[in-house]
């Protein structure tokens, strides 16, 4: 192997196969651009982004890791969200969840 060399299998890589998705219309009501990263809990995004927050609960943008979507002031666009995976625990962001997304009875 040569330093920096990448050995890549032929074909396409499908992201987030089998995960629940949702489509939501989002509008930036603020006076500044807002950028949302690929793994940000969409429910907790900037309050100037107007959309049905219930749809964004437990979801993130369905985009490639490490990328982001920018919402310009006054812009409205439709985005696809995908369910967070793993343990489905959310900490940080804007502190609105701070624990398990799926609350179980008796816990």
Curated annotation (Swiss-Prot):
Q: Name one Pfam family in it.
A: Urease_beta
One cellular component GO annotation, for this chain's record?
Answer: urease complex
The record ties this protein, via Gene3D superfamilies, to: Urease, beta subunit
Which keywords does this Swiss-Prot/TrEMBL entry list? Cytoplasm, Hydrolase
Entry EC number(s):
3.5.1.5
- Superkingdom, taxonomy of origin: Bacteria
Could you tell me which pathway this protein works in? Nitrogen metabolism; urea degradation; CO(2) and NH(3) from urea (urease route): step 1/1
Q: Name one GO molecular function term.
A: urease activity
Q: Which InterPro entries match?
A: Urease_beta-like, Urease_betasu_sf, Urease_subunit
GO biological process terms, semicolon-separated: urea catabolic process
Q: Where in the cell is it found?
A: Cytoplasm
Known catalytic reactions: urea + 2 H2O + H(+) = hydrogencarbonate + 2 NH4(+)
Please give the PANTHER family that the UniProt record associates with this protein.
Answer: UREASE
Q: State whether it acts alone or in a complex, and with which partners, per the record.
A: Heterotrimer of UreA (gamma), UreB (beta) and UreC (alpha) subunits. Three heterotrimers associate to form the active enzyme.
The similarity annotation says: Belongs to the urease beta subunit family.
Q: What is this protein called?
A: Urease subunit beta
**What is the name of the gene encoding this protein?**
ureB
């Amino acid at each position: 192997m040569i330093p920096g060399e990448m050995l890549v299998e032929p074909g396409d890589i499908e992201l987030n196969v089998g995960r629940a998705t949702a489509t939501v219309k989002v509008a930036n009501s603020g006076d500044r651009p807002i950028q949302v990263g690929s793994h940000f809990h969409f429910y907790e995004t900037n309050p100037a982004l107007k959309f049905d927050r219930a749809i964004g609960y437990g979801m993130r943008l369905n985009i490639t890791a490490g990328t982001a979507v920018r919402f310009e002031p006054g812009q409205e666009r439709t985005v696809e969200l995908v369910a967070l995976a793993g343990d489905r625990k959310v900490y940080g962001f804007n502190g609105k969840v701070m624990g398990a997304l799926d609350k179980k009875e008796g816990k």
